[in-house]
């Protein structure tokens, strides 16, 4: 996902924190209030499951959790019907995005690790982000034009070797095709897809 170094990312995605326990009567309400909208450029199976397997080494990950590269969020307040319209419009103008993971990297001065796509895929994702903004999607300033990536999470020293070994077959990964993007609501232990569109353009 897009996220510049130093920016606080959602704890469900970036940390090893656990969702509220079953005895917390207010957990469902709190989870609902903390959910945030994201546009996720979706990584397909079987690569998605392989990325989630690496993430599970460092944090609890729900089966429904999406994996994206170059995804944007959380979105600032805006009409979600308008967001759906933007997704429909841009998907009609955008071709399937093809590429692979090329490297595993760490954000500077942090323990947060991510998978980086190859240059051609990264360029296609930045073009897609421009199209979303030009069509009317509102983004927070620190999200726009950040480096496309797929987050692994915060990797403590004691599991670095395990993460590196598990991720080795993803760097480089087989070539894969990203054919969809979707509007997701994401929060602590929560993930629900509100709208999904397929890329049907030629460029």
What feature does the model see in each segment?
Residues 38, 112, 180:
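Short hydrophobic/aromatic beta-strand or adjacent loop that forms the aromatic wall/cage
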Residues 71, 114-115, 152, 183:
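Short hydrophobic/aromatic-rich beta-strand segments that constitute the beta-sheet cores
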Residues 2-98, 121-177, 192-203:
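Basic, often amphipathic N-terminal segments
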Residues 102-110, 146-148, 182-190:
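Short proline/glycine- and acidic-rich turn/helix-capping motifs at secondary-structure junctions
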Residues 113-121:
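Short histidine-centered catalytic/ligand-binding loop motif
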Residues 117, 186, 199:
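Active-site donor-binding loop signature of nucleotide-sugar glycosyltransferases
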């Amino acid at each position: 996902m897009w996220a510049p170094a130093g920016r606080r990312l959602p704890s469900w995605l970036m940390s090893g924190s656990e969702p509220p326990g079953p005895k917390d009567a207010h957990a469902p309400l709190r989870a609902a209030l903390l959910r945030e909208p994201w546009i996720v450029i979706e990584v397909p199976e079987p690569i998605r499951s392989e990325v989630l397997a690496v993430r599970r080494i460092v944090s609890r990950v729900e089966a429904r959790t999406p994996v994206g590269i170059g995804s944007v969020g959380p979105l600032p307040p805006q009409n979600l019907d308008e967001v759906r319209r933007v997704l429909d419009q841009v998907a009609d103008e955008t071709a399937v995005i093809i590429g692979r993971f090329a490297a595993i990297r760490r954000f500077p001065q942090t323990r947060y690790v991510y998978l980086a796509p190859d240059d051609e895929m990264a360029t296609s994702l930045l073009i897609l982000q421009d199209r979303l903004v030009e069509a009317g999607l509102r983004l927070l300033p620190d999200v726009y034009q950040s480096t496309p990536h797929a987050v692994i999470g915060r990797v403590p020293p004691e599991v670095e070797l395990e993460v590196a070994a598990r991720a080795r077959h993803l760097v480089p990964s087989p070539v894969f095709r990203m054919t969809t993007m979707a509007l997701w609501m994401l929060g602590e232990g929560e993930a629900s897809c509100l709208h999904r569109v397929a890329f049907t353009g030629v460029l």
